[in-house]
């Protein structure tokens, strides 16, 4: 029998103090466990597929610092490279050869990227790419999809999924109508809705931006022909297609979703994996479009810590590890085993459920499904997910503390980890 009692005294004390120091006690809303209930755990250290909290409890981790830890936490090759880089300094604020190296790796891997610009976060990348889309097309309106998250910039906080969905907010106070008046929304996987928006706004739409696989409204995959249809529509209307691959980039394939599905956008945003666990973001695409970015062109974008040598170092080493033969085959195998196992256990224990995976990304909804879009996701049993999350946590499995977040595996997860996780899930689901 798995121990279901965990000591969390120190976590509770630290989090209680944090609430007097930081809004909600956290630096990002989903970490506060608002949608799953209970107290968040406070981490002490991580290694491989595991995390340890300040009370000494160990967990199998399927959050992976929200995506970057695809090789496992604190991989010795990454840590070793970072140690050497630290000896040279933590920040230059000037060009470094490391930027060239990582840029070449990204350009070689991602089909759409001919030039790339490094920034500090996925939010920054999406903000910059929106400005670039508008400048290149000389149009203002942009189509995004309900439940797709592109960071917390004002213009994207419209049916944005992720933390906004977790907190039950339709958008955010403080966002002026003028900031979102040019942001059009459509249901994910609904080509007809996109066609209608193009017809209603002829010659006004700069482009379409989306998560090619949605990971911020749970895990939702594109229907057959959806991405191809968007590519055709944007070509037809002289608009740009942007894939936000902050989550899917280098995770569902080395070349991201665009490699996986064979659809090449005009621009791409990246983050997470390309920083190896350090703060990073990037955007890139066709040379003629990227050449508009300052100082090569008139579209301004800058950052004090952009191209940080430590982030570049961790990114380079992470991509080198992912280039090793068999890496993605391994990720596919263990993630399929996990996703299939969780779904089977849920159904066998009498719960309505659906889910799936692509490579090292997976999800489980407590609804009979299928889940094609944000509205479908919102109809899932989030209260049951909260009980499931708490039960798994108490038995040593750390899942994302929200129904509206995808799960992640890594090269560090073993078959034994997966078997143990499925066994624990059976125990939990049999009790709720």
Swiss-Prot record:
EC numbers, comma separated: 5.4.3.8
UniProt-listed GO biological process terms: chlorophyll biosynthetic process; protoporphyrinogen IX biosynthetic process
Gene3D superfamilies recorded: Aspartate Aminotransferase, domain 1 (3.90.1150.10), Type I PLP-dependent aspartate aminotransferase-like (Major domain) (3.40.640.10)
Cofactor (UniProt): pyridoxal 5'-phosphate
Enzyme class, broadest EC rank: isomerase
Keywords, ordered alphabetically: Chlorophyll biosynthesis, Cytoplasm, Isomerase, Porphyrin biosynthesis, Pyridoxal phosphate
N6-(pyridoxal phosphate)lysine modifications at: 272
Residues making up the signal peptide according to the UniProt record: none
Location in the cell: Cytoplasm
Annotated Pfam families: Aminotran_3
Gene Ontology MF, one: transaminase activity
InterPro entries the record matches: 4pyrrol_synth_GluAld_NH2Trfase, Aminotrans_3, Aminotrans_3_PPA_site, PyrdxlP-dep_Trfase, PyrdxlP-dep_Trfase_major, PyrdxlP-dep_Trfase_small
Primary location class: cytoplasm
GO CC list: cytoplasm
Pathway linked to the protein: Porphyrin-containing compound metabolism; protoporphyrin-IX biosynthesis; 5-aminolevulinate from L-glutamyl-tRNA(Glu): step 2/2; Porphyrin-containing compound metabolism; chlorophyll biosynthesis
Reaction(s) catalysed (UniProt annotation): (S)-4-amino-5-oxopentanoate = 5-aminolevulinate
Keyword hit for Isomerase: yes
Subunit structure: Homodimer.
Family assignment from sequence similarity: Belongs to the class-III pyridoxal-phosphate-dependent aminotransferase family. HemL subfamily.
Protein name per the record: Glutamate-1-semialdehyde 2,1-aminomutase
Organism, as annotated: Nostoc sp. (strain PCC 7120 / SAG 25.82 / UTEX 2576)
Gene: hemL
């Amino acid at each position: 029998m798995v121990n279901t009692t965990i000591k969390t005294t120190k976590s509770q004390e630290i989090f209680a103090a944090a609430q007097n120091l930081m809004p909600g006690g956290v630096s990002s809303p989903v970490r506060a466990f608002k949608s799953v209930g209970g107290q968040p755990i406070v981490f002490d250290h991580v290694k491989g597929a595991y995390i340890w909290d300040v009370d000494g409890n160990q967990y199998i981790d399927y959050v992976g610092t929200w995506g970057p830890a695809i090789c496992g936490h604190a991989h010795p090759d990454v840590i070793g490279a970072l140690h050497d880089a630290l000896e040279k300094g933590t920040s230059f604020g000037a060009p470094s050869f490391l930027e060239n190296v990582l840029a070449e790796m990204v350009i070689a891997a991602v089909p759409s990227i001919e030039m790339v610009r490094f920034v500090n976060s996925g939010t920054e990348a999406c903000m910059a790419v929106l400005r670039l889309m508008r400048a290149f097309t000389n149009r203002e309106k942009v189509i995004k999809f309900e439940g797709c998250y592109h960071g917390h910039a004002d213009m994207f906080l419209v049916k944005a999924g992720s933390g906004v969905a977790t907190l039950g907010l339709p958008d955010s106070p403080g966002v002026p109508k003028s900031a979102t008046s040019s942001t059009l929304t459509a249901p994910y996987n609904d080509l007809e809705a996109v066609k209608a928006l193009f017809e209603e706004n002829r010659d006004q739409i700069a482009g379409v931006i989306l998560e090619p696989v949605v990971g911020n409204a749970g895990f939702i995959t594109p229907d057959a022909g959806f991405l191809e249809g968007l590519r055709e529509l944007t070509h037809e209307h002289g608009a740009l297609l942007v894939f936000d691959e902050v989550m899917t980039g280098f995770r569902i394939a080395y070349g991201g979703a665009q490699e996986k599905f064979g659809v090449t956008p005009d621009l791409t945003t990246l983050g997470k994996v390309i920083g190896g666990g350090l703060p990073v973001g990037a955007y890139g695409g066709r040379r003629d479009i990227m050449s508009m970015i300052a100082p090569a062109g008139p579209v301004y974008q800058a950052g004090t810590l952009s191209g940080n040598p430590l982030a570049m170092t961790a990114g380079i080493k992470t991509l080198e590890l992912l280039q090793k033969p068999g890496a993605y085959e391994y990720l596919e195998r263990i993630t399929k085993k996990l996703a299939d196992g969780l779904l089977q256990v849920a159904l066998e224990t009498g719960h309505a459920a659906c889910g799936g995976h692509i490579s090292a990304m997976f999800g489980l909804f407590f609804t009979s499904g299928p889940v094609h879009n944000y509205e479908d996701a919102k109809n899932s049993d989030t209260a049951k997910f909260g009980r499931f999350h708490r039960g798994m946590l108490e038995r040593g499995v750390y899942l994302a503390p929200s129904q509206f977040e995808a799960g992640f595996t890594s090269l560090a997860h073993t078959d034994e980890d997966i078997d143990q996780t499925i066994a624990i899930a059976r125990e939990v689901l049999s009790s709720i």
